[in-house]
A protein has these predicted regions:
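Dual-mode signal for accessory low-complexity, basic/Gly-rich regions
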Residues: 4-225
């Protein structure tokens, strides 16, 4: 009998991402390195003043989760994270972050990420590696990197699949440079994210219309448009 798969809630206190990563949620932080953060707020939909900072993941270990006033087994207290929906006219609200900060310890200089990609691919005996500059299904911007000279060729109609949380438990490289993005969480709540500009991972599937699946080293630029 196959044991049931663990949900994220079941992984409290366990390693879920690379040990170099710490993830925090900020509520009232309204600017980061000169960029306005649209996820900033001072009180949630239940009238709870959220803590300015909640550490969700520390050195890769799942420490806490966001919650409202209704206690949960893994989150007995509110983090002031029930927020009003942008589209609602009747006061509906959703559990949502303010600003998520994914911070890397001892990150790699951004100009060295590509050389790290090429080195890792050569060690695996591969002919090519791939750089993903945006994730958008079949419209993803994917570039094949020639390991001999580092030249890049755009892959047409590429689709990245198989990128899941386990891929983040052991990353080959994390950029020290950070990007800042504002977005609408689940199409309902203004949120922001601060995150490494690129990460180096392996065993990601690249689907193309004219070739079979390739499992190669991949350098991704998360959330970059």
């Amino acid at each position: 009998q196959v044991p049931p798969m663990k949900t994220l809630n079941d992984r409290m206190g366990m390693k879920i991402v690379d040990s170099r990563l710490t993830i925090k949620n900020y509520s009232s932080l309204d600017k980061y390195n000169g960029t306005p953060l649209l996820g900033a707020y001072t009180i949630d939909a239940e009238g709870v003043v959220p803590p300015k900072e909640v550490t969700l993941v520390e050195n890769g270990i799942f420490k806490a989760m966001l919650n409202g006033n209704i206690p949960a087994v893994k989150a007995p207290e509110s983090t002031g994270s029930l927020r009003f929906s942008l589209s609602s006219r009747n006061g509906a609200f959703n559990l949502a972050p303010g600003t998520i900060h994914i911070k890397a310890d001892k990150g790699t200089k951004p100009e060295k990420m590509k050389s790290a990609l090429i080195k890792a691919a050569k060690e695996e005996g591969l002919k090519y590696a791939y750089i993903v500059r945006s994730l958008a299904g079949k419209a993803s911007r994917i570039y094949r990197v020639d390991l001999k000279d580092g030249s890049e060729t755009q892959v047409r109609f590429g689709d990245v699949t198989g990128f899941t949380l386990p891929n983040l438990k052991r990353m080959l490289g994390i950029s020290s440079k950070e990007n800042v993005s504002n977005f609408i969480f689940n199409g309902e709540v203004l949120s922001s994210m601060i995150y490494p500009s690129s990460i180096l991972v392996e065993n990601i599937e690249i689907n193309k219309s004219d070739v079979k699946k390739d499992k190669e080293q991949v350098l991704t630029f998360p959330l970059q448009k």
